[in-house]
């Protein structure tokens, strides 16, 4: 925040100049972190891949403050001597599904600081972070990914932050009439003729609503629980029983035509980094409800099986992020991360396809 603070940072973080000693200390620090997870394998390549991936999960969020606690808030103001470590690089659409929950297990000591950072961002910009970078809100990606991330910390019982303030931040962020939410509250869903990437936005909002509902239930806020739980079922508007896909629905209640579940046009259709094959499964919070849309477990499981064996061709100007395709299952992209585990709910046999897929 100042030349004086820069000197303090240097004195605290690098009081002397010994490159070899500094490199050795960094090696020891990373070794201690990576040893938090042990695997057994004789495959050196698999071990290297695993620990490289584990390292990547620890690169962000990153500290964004001086050693004396000074930091620049998302409102542009400088805050002095904060009683918590301020963080940034909240790539939440990318991390709330797996990396953020993993952090609660591997780095529980960081959770109070991360939660307090998110609450201060809420106070400074009026909502929880969506995709915060260097103290600035980028509003990148769809949905309200800060909500499930903060809700996870509340529901796992981490302390060091105000749970009532956390709930206020969750609720207010879920009720803001921006980024398609105003349309969602008017129509009950986001119409595809009025908003781009409508299916993706709405289905992510539905998942976030479920997270708000769970915190409301935990805190005894029954009316809010009922409201957000019902709103979390908005995904049902998009399910077409004829094609058995999630499809864009316009403001007149008509499915978008023509329809091609293999097509994905980056930032210019009803989905985000995906297509109907991939987004149809984005209901991890209500799998039984999604099974009901299909008419039962047999039809659901049959469609899920098809996901892994249909053509891997992506039609249209698809994003390169839709990667690692096995059929239309995109192993390399976020909306597919949970998909193989859906078998644990739908499959009735002892040997789950999840085992072989994983």
Residue ranges and their predicted role:
Residues 83-92, 135-143, 194-205, 264-279, ...:
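Solvent-exposed loop and edge beta-strand segments that line ligand/cofactor-binding
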Residues 1-86, 120, 127-130, 160, ...:
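Acidic/polar, glycine-enriched structural segments that form the non-catalytic walls/loops
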């Amino acid at each position: 925040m100042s030349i004086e603070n820069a000197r303090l940072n240097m004195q605290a973080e690098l009081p002397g100049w010994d490159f070899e000693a500094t490199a050795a200390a960094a090696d020891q620090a990373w070794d201690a972190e990576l040893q938090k997870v042990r695997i057994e394998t004789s495959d050196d390549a698999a071990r290297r891949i695993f620990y490289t991936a584990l390292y990547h999960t620890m690169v962000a969020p990153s500290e964004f403050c001086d050693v004396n606690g000074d930091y620049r808030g998302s409102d542009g103001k400088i805050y002095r001597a904060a009683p918590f470590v301020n963080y940034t690089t909240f790539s939440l659409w990318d991390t709330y599904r797996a990396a953020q929950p993993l952090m609660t297990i591997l780095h529980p000591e960081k959770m109070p600081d991360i939660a307090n950072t998110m609450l201060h961002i809420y106070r400074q910009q009026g909502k929880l972070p969506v995709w915060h970078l260097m103290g600035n809100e980028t509003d990148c990606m769809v949905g309200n990914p800060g909500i499930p991330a903060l809700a996870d910390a509340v529901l796992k019982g981490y302390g060091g932050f105000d749970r009532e303030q956390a709930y206020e931040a969750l609720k207010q962020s879920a009720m803001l009439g921006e980024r398609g939410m105003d349309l969602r509250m008017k129509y009950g869903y986001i119409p595809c003729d009025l908003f781009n990437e409508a299916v993706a936005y709405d289905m992510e909002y539905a998942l976030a609503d479920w997270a708000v509902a769970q915190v409301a239930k935990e805190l005894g806020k029954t009316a809010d629980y009922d409201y957000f739980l019902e709103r979390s079922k908005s995904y049902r508007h998009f399910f077409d029983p004829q094609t058995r896909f999630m499809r864009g629905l316009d403001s007149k209640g008509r499915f978008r035509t023509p329809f091609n579940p293999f097509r994905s046009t980056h930032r210019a259709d009803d989905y985000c980094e995906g297509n109907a094959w991939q987004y149809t499964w984005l209901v991890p919070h209500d799998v039984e409800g999604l099974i009901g849309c299909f008419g039962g477990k047999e039809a659901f499981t049959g469609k899920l099986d098809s996901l892994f064996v249909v053509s891997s061709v992506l039609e249209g100007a698809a994003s390169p992020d839709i990667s690692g395709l096995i059929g239309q299952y995109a192993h390399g992209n976020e909306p597919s991360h949970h998909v193989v585990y859906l078998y644990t709910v739908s499959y009735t046999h002892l040997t789950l396809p999840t085992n072989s897929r994983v």
